[in-house]
């Protein structure tokens, strides 16, 4: 743990977590509406639609847990929760990549939304690694 007079938490990382939390909530609701649109108006195979919606629900769980551990690790200056968040960044980025590239139908709106999610994942991963390095360097002093 860091000395009491040192604050090592990353403010830019915390801002990204906050913004990503709100963005992901909006993304999730829009994606549900898009799946409703696809299911009603496009010849979307039922099995694929169900699979994509179930994967979206799993993605919601992964993202909520990732943001929770990232925020707690950053604010409490703990390496373990921040490390869990780093580990969950990879499945999160893979899910965003799936929705960007591998769905049956990818709308332009989805491509834009998933590109923004990938930008958030990459930025957060970079800042998480820098923050973990800062926490580790202060443990040695």
Curated annotation (Swiss-Prot):
Predominant place of localization: membrane
Any one annotated GO CC term: cytoskeleton
Keyword vocabulary terms for this entry: Cell projection, Cilium biogenesis/degradation, Cytoplasm, Cytoskeleton, Membrane, Transmembrane, Transmembrane helix
TM annotation in the entry: 15-35, 49-69, 82-102, 115-135
Gene Ontology BP, a term: non-motile cilium assembly
Function field: Part of the tectonic-like complex which is required for tissue-specific ciliogenesis and may regulate ciliary membrane composition.
Protein name (database record): Transmembrane protein 216
Organism: Rattus norvegicus
Taxon lineage: Eukaryota, Metazoa, Chordata, Craniata, Vertebrata
């Amino acid at each position: 743990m860091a000395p009491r007079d040192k604050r090592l938490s990353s403010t830019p990382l915390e801002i990204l977590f906050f913004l990503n939390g709100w963005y992901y909530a909006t993304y999730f609701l829009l994606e549900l509406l898009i799946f409703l649109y696809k299911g009603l108006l496009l010849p979307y195979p039922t099995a694929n639609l169900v699979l994509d919606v179930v994967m979206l629900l799993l993605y919601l769980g992964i993202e909520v847990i990732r943001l929770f551990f990232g925020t707690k690790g950053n604010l409490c200056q703990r390496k373990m929760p921040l490390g869990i968040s780093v580990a969950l960044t990879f499945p999160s980025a893979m899910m965003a990549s799936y929705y960007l590239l591998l769905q049956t139908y990818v709308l332009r709106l989805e491509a834009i939304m998933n590109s923004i999610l990938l930008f958030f994942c990459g930025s957060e991963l970079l800042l998480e690694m820098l923050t973990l390095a800062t926490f580790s360097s202060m443990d040695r002093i």
